[in-house]
Amino acid sequence: MENIGTILRLAEDKILLVQNLKALQEYKVEFLGKNGIVTGELKKLGSLNEQERKEFGLKINKLKDKIQNIIKAKAEILEEQELNFKLAADKIDLTIPARRYKQGSIHPITQCSEELIQVFSQFGFTIENGPNIENDFHNFTALNFEDDHPARQMHDTFYLKSQENNKPLLLRTHTSTVQIRAMKNGKPPFRFIAPGRTYRSDSDMTHTPMFHQIEGLVMDKNINMGHLKYVITTFIKSFFENSNIELRFRPSFFPFTEPSAEVDIRMNKNDKWLEVLGCGMVHPNVLKNVGIDSSEYQGFAFGLGVERFAMLKYNIKDLRQFFEGDMRWLKHYNFGSFDIPNLAGGLTK
């Protein structure tokens, strides 16, 4: 009887002084474990008579319950203390200035490409893609380039060591190659644009060895220059968001179109005319090369440089700046990730 009281006081003294849950668990094992103090007292029941065993067993069970309650109460206190400590350690000091969030931005070429694509999508144009590495047929022959055309020369075109049909492969010099592939693999009518990288051996303030083009093709029955002029005029005014912009279609020559024209624009009457794109009716020889009957279908094509349009719209003077990676320049000419272009809300930020 006296031993039970001593055990209870010992348990109370030890448990009340515990500072963490790990130590509390150790005391739980010490008193209530398989080889614990209370368990040791229970083993004494075998040496008692029936009446003594009944009385002593009742007292031991009460002792066990009291110690369990003491441990439970202490555990709740320690858990609350640990939670409060963790919350205090994780507390945010609202008086500390926030760190500047380093957010990326959209490159002007990407933004301009998206704006151009968005405008053409209003006309119902879809997007076609093709490989950057091309063969001679798709890049030149199918587009009605003569064998001695200057564009085929080494100083204008990047040729590769790999060959196809005894002719070297090359980096495409325009995305007109996509038009050839699409016409070969499909059937008219067509209405699509082909955005992508193109490559030419040239480098100065207005030329880089790699640049971005968007070329377009419309083909159906009874297509004429009037349709071409309407699409180009509406596109230019929409992209530059200027209904008063002036355009002129100047006669020109391209192997793959006949008649051909270059389009010049000026924002105001006192400005100089600026060349922005080339266009024309698809040459009958091109249609023949892709298996389309030119007596039944006609079409027009156009091509523009994305960098050229970006320079005009964003007032960028040197084409090479697009690719130099100057962080100061990129921070100045940048667009937010959510500046999604649309005609209804205005195309630019």
Curated annotation (Swiss-Prot):
Predominant location: cytoplasm
InterPro entries: aa-tRNA-synth_II, aa-tRNA-synth_II/BPL/LPL, Phe-tRNA-synth_IIc_asu, Phe-tRNA_ligase_II_N, Phe_tRNA_ligase_alpha1_bac, Phenylalanyl-tRNA_Synthase, tRNA-bd_arm
Top class in the EC scheme: ligase
GO process terms (BP): phenylalanyl-tRNA aminoacylation
One Gene Ontology cellular component annotation held by this UniProt entry: cytoplasm
Database matches in Gene3D superfamilies: Bira Bifunctional Protein, Domain 2
EC number: 6.1.1.20
Residues where Mg(2+) binds: E258
This protein's record includes keyword Lyase: no
Cofactor dependence: Mg(2+)
GO molecular-function terms, A-Z: ATP binding; magnesium ion binding; phenylalanine-tRNA ligase activity; tRNA binding
Cell membrane as UniProt keyword: no
Cofactor binding, note field: Binds 2 magnesium ions per tetramer.
Pfam families the UniProt entry points to: Phe_tRNA-synt_N, tRNA-synt_2d
Catalytic activity: tRNA(Phe) + L-phenylalanine + ATP = L-phenylalanyl-tRNA(Phe) + AMP + diphosphate + H(+)
Keywords carried by this UniProt record: Aminoacyl-tRNA synthetase, ATP-binding, Cytoplasm, Ligase, Magnesium, Metal-binding, Nucleotide-binding, Protein biosynthesis
Source superkingdom: Bacteria
NCBIfam families according to UniProt: pheS
Subunit structure: Tetramer of two alpha and two beta subunits.
Name of protein: Phenylalanine--tRNA ligase alpha subunit
Upper taxonomic lineage: Bacteria, Pseudomonadati, Pseudomonadota, Alphaproteobacteria, Rickettsiales
